[in-house]
């Protein structure tokens, strides 16, 4: 069968039961072509991770966990149960990161429950930026690696070589940047710079004169992951404001009411913002590295 014929073959997403709910997020965009790669397993890994990194609060996580279990048990529509299963996994990541951040309804985790953060998001901005960039680098490199696999499947050897070299450049440049902050890594700075200088001419041979600019675009993609820190910081600041306004109220009942209303708003915003930004990072920065959209959903005339 010719490649152009394969591209018109209807597709079915087949994944293990625990991955199937995440097909819901993949189906929000046109399906991958028959010759492309199903991104569902990778969405199942990275989407909850990004969600938890952004929201990262024990109290919010438990509330979302209860909402997820309720949706799974009570919802009649399959799409709602799938959304509940996605939220269930994401809420667990939210609790885990909440422990790391020492946050439970904002800074109440530290003030009332004695939680000791491994990293304080309000004061450790630079480490959080580095962590976000590290996660982004891994995500982009995984996407490029899948692009190599996709190119080899399509017998596009030149494209596979280009993407492989791009991965090496990204890793080398990341190592060079890390060498300025880690004394041990400084020992390999020279060899890494030499490797980049050797790889660039080969990149031009395989991808044309604009190939280095294409690689630069990958670093632009990685910088986009700083939003994992920025949006998360906005969430914790809103929680802090809610607690302070509640504490400044003249009455206990007024304070409790204010706290409930503001934290409810923050939870709703905390579900919406991480979802949108996590999906954006997948759809724009990740899928573009390997997935060919345009697949037609297989709809059998009859099922047994």
Predicted regions and their residues:
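Conserved, carboxylate-rich catalytic/transport cores that coordinate ions
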Residues: 1-304
């Amino acid at each position: 069968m010719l490649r152009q014929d394969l591209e018109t073959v209807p597709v079915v997403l087949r994944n293990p039961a625990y991955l199937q709910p995440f097909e819901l997020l993949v189906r929000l965009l046109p399906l991958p072509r028959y010759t492309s790669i199903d991104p569902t397993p990778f969405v199942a890994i990275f989407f909850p991770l990004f969600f938890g990194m952004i929201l990262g609060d024990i109290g919010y996580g438990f509330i979302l966990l209860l909402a997820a279990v309720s949706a799974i048990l009570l919802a009649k529509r399959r799409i709602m149960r799938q959304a509940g299963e996605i939220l269930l996994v994401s809420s667990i990541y939210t609790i885990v990161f909440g422990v790391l951040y020492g946050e439970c309804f904002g800074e109440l985790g530290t003030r009332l429950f004695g939680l000791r953060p491994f990293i304080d998001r309000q004061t450790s901005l630079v480490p959080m930026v580095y962590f976000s960039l590290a996660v982004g680098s891994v995500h982009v490199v995984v996407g490029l690696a899948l692009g190599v696999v996709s190119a080899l499947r399509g017998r596009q050897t030149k494209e596979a070589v280009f993407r492989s070299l791009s991965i090496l450049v990204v890793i080398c440049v990341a190592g060079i940047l890390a060498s300025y902050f880690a004394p041990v890594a400084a020992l390999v700075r020279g060899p890494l710079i030499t490797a980049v200088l050797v790889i660039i001419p080969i990149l031009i041979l395989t991808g044309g004169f604009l190939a280095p600019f294409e690689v630069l675009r990958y670093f632009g993609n990685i910088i986009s992951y700083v939003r994992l820190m920025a949006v998360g910081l906005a969430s914790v600041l809103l929680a802090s404001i809610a607690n302070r306004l509640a504490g400044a109220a003249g009455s206990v009942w007024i304070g409790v009411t204010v706290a409930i209303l503001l934290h409810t708003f923050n939870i709703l915003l905390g579900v919406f913002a991480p979802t949108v930004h996590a999906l954006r990072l997948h759809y724009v920065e990740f899928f573009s590295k390997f997935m060919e959209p345009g697949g037609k959903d297989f709809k059998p005339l009859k099922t047994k």
